[in-house]
A protein has these predicted regions:
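Residue-level recognition of tetratricopeptide repeat
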Residues: 23, 56, 90-93
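Periplasmic peptidoglycan-binding/tethering modules of Gram-negative envelope proteins
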Residues: 102-212
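Start-of-helix register in tetratricopeptide repeats
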Residues: 16, 49-50, 83-86, 120-121
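Periplasmic OmpA-like peptidoglycan-binding domain that tethers envelope proteins to the cell wall
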Residues: 218-287
Length: 287
């Protein structure tokens, strides 16, 4: 389904005319023609609407490289965080189609952080990817690509707008690693140990030698608040010890924090066991 956006384009009669023609072509499922009209629209005047719709039209045709470029352009031109979040989410959706699920999840989660009321399709897409990768090993290259996008790519250019229209500081780069402890314990399973080995290899690279990292442990929502806080701290400590043991150069550069159940990805007591598992996670912030 080709969903036209509510126009945010300033006065630009020629660009608007081509944009309207593109919407008509899209509604008729003629996405190739829609792209042609949208290319003419952005030639007349750059606009968020035209670039975002071009991303959707290219995505529909599985022209993934072109779709990623269009969504990136749209994000740069977004009039507000809400619009930027939608384009970032579509960018993530396109990455998933390209097999880059870990990087896709990074995009979708950032979009949900930015949007005041994320549409259900963003949440559902993120959850499905989350479920698909939770039992999969994470490669060093996936972690590096995710960080590169946050530090030098699309997300590096995203700022939250303040009331006066200026830009605030960027959000710290972060990595989220699925972790699986034995129930009510701090014992790491084999997959988590392998994922931490990939994480440690990245954090110990020369490019990060002057950086410190904050490890934040999260629990599921079962149990008392204080108990979960203590458990998350203990788990973060266990992860710190695992990393330092295998990567001594990280000693003294890791800070730990237990978030307990304060920031669940999936809220409520009556959620599935899979959702409880996804709430148990490690976030790594680069300071």
């Amino acid at each position: 389904m080709f969903i036209p956006l509510k126009s945010t384009q300033a006065s630009c009669p020629e660009g608007n005319r081509y944009l309207d023609l593109a919407k008509k072509s899209g509604s008729q499922q003629d996405f190739s023609q829609a792209v042609t009209w949208l290319e003419r629209s952005v030639e007349s005047c750059d606009s968020y609407d035209a670039w975002h719709l071009m991303g959707m039209a290219q995505q529909k045709q599985r022209n993934l490289k072109e779709a990623l470029n269009a969504y990136s352009q749209a994000t740069e031109l977004a009039p507000n965080d809400q619009s930027a979040a939608i384009s970032i989410a579509r960018y993530g959706q396109t990455l998933a189609l390209n097999g880059q699920r870990y990087e896709a999840l990074t995009m979708l989660e950032r979009a949900m952080d930015m949007h005041p009321n994320p549409p259900s399709w963003i949440q559902n897409t993120a959850k499905q990817i989350d479920l698909n990768i939770v039992d999969q090993p994470i490669s060093r290259e996936s972690i590096k690509r995710s960080l590169s996008t946050q530090e030098f790519g699309l997300l590096a250019n995203v700022r939250s707008k303040t009331k006066d229209g200026s830009k605030s500081e960027t959000v710290s780069s972060r990595i989220r690693i699925p972790i699986n402890f034995e129930y009510d314990s701090i014992n790491l399973d084999e997959l988590t140990q392998k994922n931490l080995a990939q994480l440690g290899a990245v954090l110990s690279e020369d490019k990060y030698r002057d950086r410190t990292f904050t490890l934040i442990g999260h629990t599921d929502v079962r149990g008392t608040t204080q108990y979960n806080h203590n458990l998350s701290e203990s788990r973060a400590e266990a992860i710190e010890q695992e990393l330092v043991e295998n990567f001594p150069e990280l000693k003294g550069r890791l800070k730990i924090k237990g978030a307990g159940e304060s920031s669940p990805k999936y809220k409520g007591q009556k959620i599935s066991e899979d959702e409880h598992r996804l709430n148990r996670r490690l976030e790594v912030f680069i300071n």
